[in-house]
Amino acid sequence: MIFLLFVVFPFVYAQLLPELLAGFQNGRFRGGPDGFNRGPGGFHRGPDGFGGDPRGGVDLGHLIGNIAANVGQEMGLNDADVIGDLRGISRGPRPSSMEWGRRARHFCRRYPGHPKCQRGQLPQFTDVPTIINTIIYNAGDLLPRVPTLNIHDPLAGLNSELVGFIKSLQSQFGQLSSQQRNEIHDSCRSFKCDQQSPQNTQAKQELLTKMLAFDQAVGGKAAPAHDKVNLRFDRTQQVKQALLKRANLSHIIVPADNGVFDRDVLLTEHQANFLLNELGEAGRGADVGAGGGGGGRVPRSGVFFQESAVQKWDIWKPIQYTLDDSLEESDKKDIRDALHEISINTCILFRYNATPKGYHLNYMKVDSTTFCGLSYVGRTDPANPIYLSFQCGDNRGVAMHETMHALGVSHQHLRLDRDKYIKIDWSNIDPQHYDTFAISDAKLYTSYGTKYAYDSIMHYNAYLGAKDPNKPTMIPLVNPQENTPKLGQRAKLTRGDIRLLKKMYCRPGCDDQNVHCGTWALHGYCKMKEQMKWMNENCKASCDKC
């Protein structure tokens, strides 16, 4: 969603700066502005015209398609991609003062901390090389400041034994051992770790177009402006950069700037800010005036839903869903079958509505080979878009996987206890996708006492993100010959998947009061005499006490 936002790195320096300097030496820039991509071809486009307001009864699937067709024109010459915009200008004739002023103002909205944007000033056209160079090395300092959040410590005031046990298991979010770091470092000797691929750039631009169309269709006049949508993508990239910084790898690796976290997860701005706080990035960036993109305090309960019912779906009535016009009839059947499998195995019901009001799931097709599906984790405001490519096989299973994300379920292989069950071959991972293998922050997700399952529909396959596709990146530590083929299955919900959903949604009043309850339950604390009373009172779901 989030997506724009080329937070540019050394590859831009290598490719753009010589080109710009040559333009200056010749007294003009080469080429013409017509090289800009006015609209990604990878997304389904609807007919011309915006259509009406979905709240007025217009089919939401039609509306999103109509808006998507116009987003490119509304954005102008790649206006959402500031650096790409500069690149296009550098190849054409010198723009008029009015045209350059418009682009310079847009740049300063995106990067309010840039030295050329201070005290009401704007960069000049001759500043283009300096602008690019500054962003390459200091983008995080130029974006709106990361807000400092009041994050509750779930271990505060607890029994020393419970605290000590969690700390003995807890690996610091994003941390690597020296051996693991060296293995990744060695990979970069033969892998272009400091260059952004064109595929990432294209995927991000396509996703931005789709997300802008969705926000406009669902939010109407209340939809966030382009800069606000762009900031989600900037924050996502900042999280990936911060993870590499924590692992002491940021000086050699440029994370994939594709707008996506962990291959198929979209981060809201609040979720990204939470992760940045956990990674020590709170307060980084520039102050912006009223209406700026990054301010405001967000309470802990507003980010993910383990400690708050706010982000959970109300399942006392069916969850509304709608199907975009981009979907073929066979695609719609796969989605309906996926929702049916969830419903027959749990208490969660779904109801189709062509003109949904309020929170709902919105399924859309994206003609992309870069991902199978994308979704937010947990319920989002005003609705949850779920993007599916239908190009990976097991379409019904992929739809279930992404719907599970929307219901609030994280990936199996990022659990706190992951390293007890699988071994990551750090020497074979794509270093630019390090976020795919970094164990989740322990404060965010709970297992609800369900055991690690190799066959979970929420597990990735053994070869995901591999440099050498013939070698696995994830190797089961228990019976690898039998369990390796199970990783990444999308045929059905497993017993563990169903049990987790039931604990999350199907036991009214049976809640955990601490995000670590699932971990304690799996290690027998529900039945230990010294901890039994506290566990049974505070970890009812994980201890199966209701």
Curated annotation (Swiss-Prot):
Enzyme class, first EC level, given as a word:
hydrolase
Query: How is the co-factor bound, per the entry?
Result: Binds 1 zinc ion per subunit.
Q: What is the disulfide pattern of this chain?
A: C347-C506, C372-C392, C510-C546, C517-C539, C526-C543
Question: Which tissues does the record link to its expression?
Answer: Expressed in hypodermis, uterus and spermatheca.
Signal peptide residues are 1-14
Q: Cellular location of this protein? A: Secreted
Q: What Gene3D superfamilies does the database record attribute to this sequence?
A: Collagenase (Catalytic Domain) (3.40.390.10)
> What's the short name of a Pfam family annotated to this entry?
ShK
**What's the protein name?**
Zinc metalloproteinase nas-9
Encoding gene per record: nas-9
